[in-house]
Amino acid sequence: MNEFKHDLAVAYRIYPKVSSHPPPVFADDKLKLARLCLNSFKASLGNLRVKMWVLLDDCPPIYEELFSRLWAPDDLVWMRYPGVKDAATFREQVRILMEQTDAEMVYLAEDDYFYLPDQFPLAVNFLKHNPDAHFVSPYDHPDIYTTELHKLPRETRVAEGKNWNSCFSTTHTFLTRRDTLRECNWVFLAPYGRVSPDLAKWMALTKRRVFNPIAFARWSVTCRFWAGSIFLAWYYCWRQILFGKKYTLWVPHPSIANHMVAGMEAPGIDWQKEFDQRPPKV
């Protein structure tokens, strides 16, 4: 008998200002962007039974209405914060999803992702049917195919019309199991100072690109962000790199979602057409 009442537990953090990386639509209206993304997320969930924690970071009341129009009151838990920003709310997401008892599958969501309808169950199913897969990003990162950093051998698995490709980094939006999150929670919860380096964390968890001093030396000149991420991975997570479990991260192609950063659209999909087909409801 399944001990869980829901198929998925979600911690969805939302902030009322547009990112410094402008989105492809509604670059001057965060409320419309948030509504578009949230409506698309709801449509993508299909028939999944979802428990939602809403992390409102300095949000006016109208942002609560975005969620209350889409989910029943019993499926919503409100968490309010006074403008604590990304790093703090991310740690809260991890804490909430580790401690909850509603679902085995957990999803940490940021407010600037757009989803395709009825697609999210595919990500949940992939994790269920692949015990050696630990994390899934719904976003098929374009830089996986274009940058030197990601020029590494990849494994591909085919499931439900998607090619699922192994990779080693994503953002702070990802799907995993509650037990996996508990295993490696300290990597996500470590005090990284004023930064919250997602690339460094994923390097430590997947153990990719952290054992190549030649590349580190070269990138110290040509791409300091990559080199800096390797340094941060070792500085904060050396125990994980040397003694921890090696985790795997997977992304779908074609993508299930798009990170709303202009110029970083997931490949192979006409995203503008998708946005136009699902305008934000008033």
What is each of the regions a protein language model found here?
Residues P24-R49:
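Short, acidic, metal-binding catalytic loop of nucleotide-sugar glycosyltransferases
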Residues E3-K5, R178, E183-V282:
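C-terminal catalytic/acceptor-binding lobe
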Residues M105, F114-A190:
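Conserved catalytic core of nucleotide-sugar-dependent glycosyltransferases
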Residues V18-K32, F188-G193:
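Short, flexible/disordered intra-domain loops and linkers
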Residues L8-S19, D57-D58, P138-H141, H253-S255:
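Short loop/turn segments at strand-loop or loop-helix junctions that form parts
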Residues P60-E104:
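Active-site-proximal specificity loops/subdomain of glycosyltransferases
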Residues L8, S44-W53, L76-V77, E104:
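Short loop->beta transition adjacent to catalytic acidic/histidine clusters or analogous donor-positioning motifs
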